[in-house]
C-alpha cells in the first residue's frame, strides 16, 4: 500500500492510508499467512509459535511492548517461552532474510528500485541491553541512553520496506571494562567493533551479492557520505547510481588537478609519493562553491508537503573532484541545495551519476 502523493514534480506528501474495518478484521489471518512462509527457518514448533505471538504483540496497541506485557496480551502467550525464544532459541537468520527479500522483490521489486541507508535510535531506561550507551539518538536529536541500529530500506513505485539491519555496538563495549557485560549479553567473541558506515557497507555488499532485490539507486545521509569505506562499497555496485549527503566543509576542485611524483629517502630507502604542483589552486568547500554560484544556476523544486503547505528548495550542481588528504580523489557530481530567502542555508550531496545525467534524476 502506498501513501497518497503528488504525481508531478513535488515528491511525497505526508502519508495518508485509507483503512477500513475490513482491513483490520483480517489482519491476524494475513499475519499468520505471512509468518507461515518462514516455517522452514525454525527447527522446532515452540519457537516458531512464540515468534508469531511476539509479532502479534509488536503489532498491538500496547503502550509497553516488552516481553511480559506482550505475552500476557496475546492468546496462548507464555512469558518464559517468549523470553527464551528471544534470548536462547536458534533460527536460521540467513534463510529468513533471503525468504523475506524474495517476498519484497515479488511485491515491489523494480529494476530502478532505490536502496536507502540510515540509522535510528531507541531510547533505553536501563543498561542491560547489548550496545546500550549514552550516544546520539536520532529519534530525539540529542545524546541519550539508547541503542542505535543501522538500517537498509527498499523503495519503488509499488511500496517500501525495511530489508536489513545491523546493531551498532559502541567502541567502549569492546574494552576490558565491558567484558562482563558482553558475556552477560552473550556477545560472540568474534564480534569486533565496526563504525556505522562500515556496518552499512556490509549490508550494501550483502544485498548486492545476494541478488534478490533489484536496485538502481542508493541514497544515504552525511555520516555515510563522509565515509571512504561506505563509498567504496557503493562504487563496487556496478550500474548503481548513488546520492549521498556530504559535510559542508567537503573540499573539491572544479577541474581535476595534475599530480607529480616526488621521491624522498626514509631510513635509507628511496620512496615516492604523489604531490600537487605549487601552482595548484586551493580546493573549495562545498559551501563556498554554492555561495559563488549566480542565481541563474539554481533550479527551484517542490520536494515535499509540509503542515503549512509545499516545501521548496533551490538546487544546482557542479562536476567536481574531491580532495582527500590533500590530493585528488573520486570525481562526481556535487549537488547543492539551498533554502529560499535572503539568508539561505546550504547542503551538499555527492553523486556518482554519469556526466550526461540530468539534474532532475537527483532531485525528486
Give the label of every model feature segment.
Residues 1-32:
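Charged, often Cys/His-bearing segments associated with DNA-binding zinc-finger transcription factors
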Residues 24-52, 183-187:
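Basic, short loop/linker segments at the boundary and entry of helix-turn-helix/winged-helix-like folds
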Residues 32, 158-185, 189-193, 243-248, ...:
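An anionic, glycine-rich sequence signature occurring as long contiguous blocks
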Residues 42-50, 140-145, 340:
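Structural motif
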Residues 43-54, 58, 62-127, 206, ...:
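Electropositive nucleic-acid engagement tracts
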Residues 70-71, 111-125, 152, 218-224, ...:
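Short, conserved catalytic/metal-binding motifs centered on acidic residues
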Residues 86-171, 178-182, 318:
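Active-site-proximal, Lys/Arg-enriched surface segment
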Residues 181-263:
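Domain-level cores of phosphate- or acyl-group-handling catalytic modules
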Amino acid at each position: 500500500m502506498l501513501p497518497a502523493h503528488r504525481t508531478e514534480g513535488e515528491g511525497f506528501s505526508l502519508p495518508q492510508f485509507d483503512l477500513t474495518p475490513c482491513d483490520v478484521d483480517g489482519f491476524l489471518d494475513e499475519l499468520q499467512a505471512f509468518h507461515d512462509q518462514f516455517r522452514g527457518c525454525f527447527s522446532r514448533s515452540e519457537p516458531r509459535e512464540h515468534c508469531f505471538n511476539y509479532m502479534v504483540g509488536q503489532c498491538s496497541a500496547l503502550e509497553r511492548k516488552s516481553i511480559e506485557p506482550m505475552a500476557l496480551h496475546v492468546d496462548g502467550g507464555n512469558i518464559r517461552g517468549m523470553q527464551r525464544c528471544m534470548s536462547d532459541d536458534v533460527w536460521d537468520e540467513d534463510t529468513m532474510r533471503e525468504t523475506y527479500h524474495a517476498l519484497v522483490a515479488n511485491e515491489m521489486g523494480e529494476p530502478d528500485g532505490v536502496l536507502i541507508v540510515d540509522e535510528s535510535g531507541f531510547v533505553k531506561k536501563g543498561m542491560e541491553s547489548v550496545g546500550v550507551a549514552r550516544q546520539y539518538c536520532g529519534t530525539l536529536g540529542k545524546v541519550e541512553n539508547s541503542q542505535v541500529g543501522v538500517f537498509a530500506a527498499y523503495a519503488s513505485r509499488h511500496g517500501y520496506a525495511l530489508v536489513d539491519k545491523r546493531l551498532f555496538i559502541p567502541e567502549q563495549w569492546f574494552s576490558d571494562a565491558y567484558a562482563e557485560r558482553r558475556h552477560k549479553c552473550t556477545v560472540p567473541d568474534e564480534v569486533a567493533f565496526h563504525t556505522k558506515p562500515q556496518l552499512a557497507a556490509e549490508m550494501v555488499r550483502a544485498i548486492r551479492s545476494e541478488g534478490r532485490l533489484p536496485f538502481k539507486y542508493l541514497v544515504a545521509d552525511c555520516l555515510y557520505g563522509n565515509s571512504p569505506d561506505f563509498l567504496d562499497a557503493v562504487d563496487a555496485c556496478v550500474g548503481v547510481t548513488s546520492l549521498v549527503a556530504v559535510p559542508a566543509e567537503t573540499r573539491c576542485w572544479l577541474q581535476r588537478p595534475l599530480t607529480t611524483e616526488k621521491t624522498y629517502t626514509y631510513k635509507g630507502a628511496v620512496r615516492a609519493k604523489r604531490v600537487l604542483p605549487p601552482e595548484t589552486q586551493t580546493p573549495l568547500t562545498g559551501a563556498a562553491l554554492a555561495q559563488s554560484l549566480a542565481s541563474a544556476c539554481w533550479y527551484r523544486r517542490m520536494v515535499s508537503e509540509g503542515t503549512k503547505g509545499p516545501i521548496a528548495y533551490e538546487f544546482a550542481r557542479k562536476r567536481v573532484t574531491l580532495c582527500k588528504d590533500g590530493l585528488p580523489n573520486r570525481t562526481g557530481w556535487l549537488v547543492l541545495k539551498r533554502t529560499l530567502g535572503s539568508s539561505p542555508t546550504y547542503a551538499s550531496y555527492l553523486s556518482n551519476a554519469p556526466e550526461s545525467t540530468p539534474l532532475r534524476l537527483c532531485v525528486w
